[in-house]
Amino acid sequence: MSIDFDWSKLDSELEAKVLHLLEGQVSNLSLPSYIKHLKVVDFHFGKVSPQITIQEIGDPDPQFYENEAFELANQELEGDQCSRNNVSPVLTDLPPYAAEHPFSRLAYFNPAFNSPGILSASGLTSPIPESRPSTPMDNHQERDRSNDFQVTAHVSYDGDANLSLEAVLSMNYPNSEFAVLPFKLSFIRISIDAIAVLAKMGKRTHLCFVDTLLHGTGEHASSVIRDLTVESIIGESNKQLLKNVAKVEKFVSEKVKRIIEDELVWPSYITIE
């Protein structure tokens, strides 16, 4: 079943949230010596909407509930006044959700694809566990899950969402930062072809993509992002400019791809509350 929706409803407030998320990720990148002060300066969803075909509507994947249970236990652990040495080993091994970005949740389970629900929708398979592992939530009263649901859909997008970054290119010979040039890079087109999973659980909405490697080739390939169109300008506007510098474009575009995959490709996902 194909659906249409009003892409223009994605307002500036949501764009600001995405921008904030990207800023945090870019600030943590390891940069080569010739690139300094890389930062995100602008993001827009654009006017072209994706094509979405719903494949399945059902219950949320069990791993979402596992993560929810561990997060609840983690919150209780933070409020506990007992010393860490007296805490049960089950709780001391919890993932550090509190240190994560407020719009991001990372699934800390290995192997990554133990959950058959999301994988089966993409045509991949994995063994179904014989029994559901116990979690800290087993000893607590669970919230009402009767209205929880999950939508699995094929998403095809070839649109004008755009992202702009700024940096400084540094010439470090004969001395460090012997010469510096301002640098601006813009992603003006992105092409995505992937399976998307959206799970509505209480007041939270989880979103991720499933990488099936249908289009990927090479060690770091991904089937989610098929293409990125990049433009770059080096220099000051009132002086001679260099445009579309391939080496810098390649480095930054690969880093941006990796950020998107780390945040949005299962077993990682973003959470909106």
From Swiss-Prot:
Which pairs of Cys residues are joined through disulfide bonds in the record? none
* GO BP annotations listed: intermembrane phospholipid transfer; mitochondrial genome maintenance; mitochondrial membrane organization; mitochondrion-endoplasmic reticulum membrane tethering; phospholipid transport; protein insertion into mitochondrial outer membrane
Query: InterPro entries attached here?
Result: Mdm12 (IPR027532), SMP_LBD (IPR031468)
Where does it localize?
Mitochondrion outer membrane; Endoplasmic reticulum membrane
Where does it primarily localize? mitochondrion
Recorded hits in CDD domains, A to Z, give: SMP_Mdm12
Domain SMP-LTD, first and last residues per copy: 1-273
A GO MF label: mitochondrion-endoplasmic reticulum membrane tether activity
Q: Which GO CC annotations does the UniProt entry carry? A: endoplasmic reticulum membrane; ERMES complex
Residue span of region Disordered: 124-145
For this UniProt record, give its keywords in alphabetical order, as a comma-separated list: Endoplasmic reticulum, Lipid transport, Lipid-binding, Membrane, Mitochondrion, Mitochondrion outer membrane, Transport
Q: What is known of its domains?
A: The SMP-LTD domain is a barrel-like domain that can bind various types of glycerophospholipids in its interior and mediate their transfer between two adjacent bilayers.
Q: What the protein does?
A: Component of the ERMES/MDM complex, which serves as a molecular tether to connect the endoplasmic reticulum (ER) and mitochondria. Components of this complex are involved in the control of mitochondrial shape and protein biogenesis, and function in nonvesicular lipid trafficking between the ER and mitochondria. Mdm12 is required for the interaction of the ER-resident membrane protein mmm1 and the outer mitochondrial membrane-resident beta-barrel protein mdm10.
Q: Which family does it belong to?
A: Belongs to the MDM12 family.
Spell out the subunit comment: Component of the ER-mitochondria encounter structure (ERMES) or MDM complex, composed of mmm1, mdm10, mdm12 and mdm34. A mmm1 homodimer associates with one molecule of mdm12 on each side in a pairwise head-to-tail manner, and the SMP-LTD domains of mmm1 and mdm12 generate a continuous hydrophobic tunnel for phospholipid trafficking.
The protein in question is named Mitochondrial distribution and morphology protein 12
Query: Which source organism?
Result: Schizosaccharomyces pombe (strain 972 / ATCC 24843) (Fission yeast)
Organism phylogeny: Eukaryota, Fungi, Dikarya, Ascomycota, Taphrinomycotina
